[in-house]
Amino acid sequence: MKQLLDFIPLIIFFALYKFYDIYVATGALIAATTVQVIVTYAMYKKVEKMQLITFVMVALFGGMTLALHDDNFIKWKVTIVYVVFALGLTISQIMGKPAIKGMLGKELTLPDAVWSTINWAWVMFFSGCAALNLYVAYHLPLDVWVNFKVFGLLAATLVFTLLTGGYIYKHLPHEPKQKNQ
């Protein structure tokens, strides 16, 4: 349910962009993200840091997009969110407390080296997405950027999450099979 809730603002943004324009879509994105945070808090009594960072960035850069009638701000929002996530993971790694382990470590027992590898992999993923977003945003038409933002980055994140899951599975402690006596 929570994962579905995370996609609703993105779906609304895409639909309103296709029917109207980037400014209507951006206004709706701000409103939908605000409602999403409120509903998440009402249902779970907490809001995750990543969701709060995304909300603040949507409100800030979306607001600037609308106030200045300049779609460059909403384009930059995507890159800045990814850079913030990459920096957060980098800082957590340097401090010896990989954020990925903090998020998943209660459910999974893995060696510290594995957590470190996963953490650095996500740093690289977020950094790559940030750079790729800038390229698409400023070298291709707005329609292409919107499709990339909604479908390309979503698909890349899904694939990378699955790859991370496979890497985790490979390193999970497996109980030896017992022989029937």
Curated annotation (Swiss-Prot):
Q: Which domain of life is it from?
A: Bacteria
* Keyword Endoplasmic reticulum in annotation: no
| Disulfide cross-links | none
Tell me the compartments it is located in. Answer: Cell inner membrane
Q: Which residues cross the membrane?
A: 10-30, 50-70, 80-100, 120-140, 148-168
CC terms in the record's Gene Ontology section: plasma membrane
Which NCBIfam families did the record assign?
ispZ, PRK00259.1-2, PRK00259.1-3
Protein name according to UniProt: Inner membrane-spanning protein YciB
Q: Which organism is it from?
A: Vibrio cholerae serotype O1 (strain ATCC 39315 / El Tor Inaba N16961)
Q: What gene name is listed for this protein?
A: yciB
